[in-house]
Design a protein with these regions (language model features):
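Crotonase-fold acyl-CoA enzyme core
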Residues: 119-134, 145-156, 163-165, 169-229
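C-terminal long alpha-helix characteristic of the crotonase
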Residues: 207-269
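C-terminal extensions of enzymes
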Residues: 258-289
Length: 289
């Protein structure tokens, strides 16, 4: 990061660490800043609140934007994993309680975030996912919501929700269809297989693939390149919104299907969720140790 412009730490919330350039043109947001406490690197509610709070704080009103001024937001992770997806412990609890309202509130917060990221925080930001560890379920949906996915080799990526009878309902299908055919998007979702980042690159889902340890340098180079033609990249943000829009209502409609599908799951599916949670906890505690 220092090769572009020396970054300074500007924001420290409980679950994220943010480093920003002095002029505010680049923000690197690292999820799971509390990973040393043995927490699971998934979309816990407090992580989402910290992420969306920060992104809202740097979103400019139309009157605040300068013509030709392009900004960048990089989403990365302090944990070994990029993000393992939704909070399955919470899901199982809410499903057992038949609490549709709370489950929908969680899903809506996810949609609020990925929609804001996908639309470039109002249009003047290019969003980049830096995937240096596993991106599963909602973690992959987060990456897919970004304009560009930069991934290091050997990382696992996938949408395994079908293993417990569910589907990824926070943007996966909508965002995948912008990168691959509808048929391939359905295959990835319904088969639930894990892919390496190398395979995802060949499919056209990962935009930039680099060797292990070279992800940050690749993102720096990408930002430098885009900053040489800011007007073109700002225009492309607008063009994407016209030619290939992913609307908020579309995302919310799909996530309501997700909520209703989740509430119909049986005990076998919930036990599968809980086994995955235990595996995540073992991973988190091994890292914290």
């Amino acid at each position: 990061m220092s090769n572009i412009e020396k970054l300074q730490r500007t924001t420290q919330l409980d679950t994220i660490r943010v480093e920003s350039s002095p002029n505010g043109s680049a923000h690197w947001m690292y999820m799971h800043a509390d990973i040393d406490w043995g927490v699971r690197p998934c979309f816990r509610t407090n992580l989402m609140e910290d992420m969306w709070s920060f992104l809202t704080s740097i979103t400019l009103r139309d009157s605040q934007r300068q013509a030709g001024e392009l900004r960048h937001v990089v989403i990365a992770s302090k944990a070994q994993a990029f993000n393992l997806g939704g909070d399955l412990h919470l899901f199982a609890q809410l499903i057992r309680d038949n609490n549709r309202q709370k489950l929908l509130e969680y899903a809506r917060r996810c949609i609020d975030g990925v929609y804001h990221i996908h639309t470039g925080l109002g249009g003047d930001v290019r969003t980049i996912a830096l995937v240096q560890g596993d991106a599963l379920g909602g973690g992959l949906e987060l990456a897919l919501s970004c304009h560009t996915i930069v991934a290091e080799e050997g990382v696992n990526m996938g949408l395994p929700e079908v293993l417990f009878g569910l589907f990824p309902g926070m943007g996966a299908y909508s965002f995948l269809r912008k990168r691959v055919s509808s048929q391939l998007a359905e295959k990835i979702i319904l088969e639930g297989d894990l892919y390496t980042s190398d395979e995802m690159y060949k499919l056209g889902i990962v935009d930039v693939l680099v060797p292990k340890g070279e992800g940050e340098a690749a993102v720096e180079a990408l930002i430098r390149k885009q900053q040489r033609s800011p007007h073109a990249h700002l225009a492309m943000n607008a063009v994407r919104g016209i030619a290939e829009p992913v609307g908020y209502n579309e995302l919310m409609g799909i996530t309501e299907v997700w909520v209703d599908t989740a509430l119909a799951l049986g005990e076998k599916s919930l036990r599968t969720m809980e086994r995955i949670v235990k595996a995540q906890e073992r991973l988190a505690h091994s890292v914290a140790a």
